[in-house]
């Protein structure tokens, strides 16, 4: 039996997937582990790229998009790792992250699931790194905006557990599916992911069932980066439908015993939220089609700071000239010097790192120190000769 099985469900995000596996290979260096990618019928050459560049990765090819839950369950049933890590393809894992997490879980045998400190592309902390169970009352606080108004309040801010410290392990309730380390014996007891959830909500449901099964869910302060949404399209009608439908599925599954007087207002709030999201989406698209809004290539409107070896910066110079990018070139990731450079830039800036000379752990550390500036992360991908940003692949 292997110590760890890593499962990645992929759908049309080839560049992010290759980057994710590059970071994984470094993080798994001294761990007996296997990587399984379940591809939900991608059409962007993801499978061919995996076979070419990462032949050690096991690939399961689905004939159609079966959804996140079912795809993960397929891989879980075919593997035997003591721990199972569900990982989004649009993530970067620091070199120390997985070994630190496994050591912690080994020391806490009552743990069921564990999540980590997720950073957004701009280096800020992703609040969904720690969440509470969305009970009717907690859901009301979230949907009404009270959670956002009082994020550190123990009652009103419980959805994101904003009152907990970030720099130490904490008991939490809901672990994000973007990085969800699971104990296989716990899965054997409470069951796999509920396939009624096509996408979204399955992590909430599984985390809740682990709690009901007597396990403890943890937050651990090791870092990963989550581009958050590059593996989905959050501006689509389908996203709005699937996301809010998942909320209703969870609500019906776990709180149907409550009276209509309690459940109906929450259900109505969910429907109203979904309707408002759709109206906003349709209005925005109408403005674009009528010429009242300018559609810009977000990634190419700001400044770029390329940090790495000469091989990397030379390749990025060619790309910059091709696309007319405003570019600065550095040979080391010194936060103090980078801050001085950023003081001279007026636009949103993308820091593009060289993964051959700068560790992923160092990249994330630098981004944390840039968190109050208008900065996003980028990387240069040697395999495809591409610049990967949070919003665009530039070649």
Each predicted region: which residue ranges?
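Short, flexible, basic/aromatic active-site loop/helix in glycosyltransferases
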Residues: 133-172
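Conserved donor NDP-sugar-binding/catalytic core segment of glycosyltransferases
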Residues: 92-128
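A conserved acidic beta->alpha catalytic loop
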Residues: 23, 39-48, 64
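Glycine-rich, basic loop-to-helix element that forms the pyrophosphate-binding segment
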Residues: 61-79, 100
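Short aromatic/hydrophobic "clamp" motif used to bind/position activated sugar donors
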Residues: 84
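A short, conserved alpha-helix in the catalytic core of glycosyltransferases
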Residues: 165-167, 173-223
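Active-site-adjacent helix/loop segment of glycosyltransferases
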Residues: 208-284
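Short, well-formed alpha-helical segments that are part of the catalytic scaffolds
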Residues: 8, 13-28, 316
């Amino acid at each position: 039996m292997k110590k760890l099985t890593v499962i990645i469900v992929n759908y049309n995000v080839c560049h992010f997937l290759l980057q994710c596996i590059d970071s994984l290979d470094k993080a798994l260096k001294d761990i007996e582990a296997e990587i399984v990618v379940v591809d939900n019928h991608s059409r962007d050459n993801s499978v061919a790229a995996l076979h070419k560049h990462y032949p050690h990765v096991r690939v399961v090819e689905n004939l159609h998009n079966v959804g996140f839950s079912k795809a993960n369950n397929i891989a879980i049933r075919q593997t035997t790792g003591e721990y199972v890590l569900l990982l989004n393809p649009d993530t970067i894992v620091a070199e120390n992250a997985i070994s630190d997490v496994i050591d912690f879980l080994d020391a806490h045998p009552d743990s069921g699931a564990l999540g980590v400190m997720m950073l957004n592309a701009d280096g800020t902390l992703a609040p969904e790194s720690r969440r509470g169970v969305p009970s009717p009352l907690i859901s009301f606080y979230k949907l009404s905006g009270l959670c956002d108004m009082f994020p550190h309040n123990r009652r009103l801010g419980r959805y994101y557990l904003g009152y907990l410290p970030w720099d130490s392990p904490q008991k939490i309730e809901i672990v994000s599916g973007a990085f969800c380390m699971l104990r296989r014996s716990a899965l054997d007891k409470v069951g796999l992911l509920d396939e009624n959830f096509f996408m979204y909500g399955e992590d909430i449901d599984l985390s809740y069932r682990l709690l009901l099964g007597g396990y403890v869910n943890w937050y651990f302060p090791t870092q990963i980066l989550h581009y958050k949404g590059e593996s989905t399209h959050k501006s689509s009608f389908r996203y709005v439908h699937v996301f809010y439908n998942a909320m209703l599925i969870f609500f019906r599954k776990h709180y149907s015993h409550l009276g209509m007087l309690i459940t109906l207002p929450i259900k109505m709030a969910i429907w109203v939220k979904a309707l408002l999201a759709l109206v906003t989406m349709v209005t925005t698209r109408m403005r674009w089609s009528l010429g009242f809004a300018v559609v810009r290539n977000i990634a190419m409107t700001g400044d770029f700071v390329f940090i790495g070896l000469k091989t990397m910066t030379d390749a990025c110079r060619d790309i910059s000239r091709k696309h007319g990018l405003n570019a600065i070139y550095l040979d080391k990731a010194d936060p103090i010097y980078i801050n001085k450079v950023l003081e001279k830039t007026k636009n949103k800036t993308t820091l593009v790192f060289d993964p051959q000379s700068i560790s992923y752990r160092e990249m994330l550390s630098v981004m944390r120190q840039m968190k109050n500036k208008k900065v996003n992360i980028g990387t240069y991908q040697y395999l495809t000769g591409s610049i990967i940003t949070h919003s665009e692949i530039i070649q």
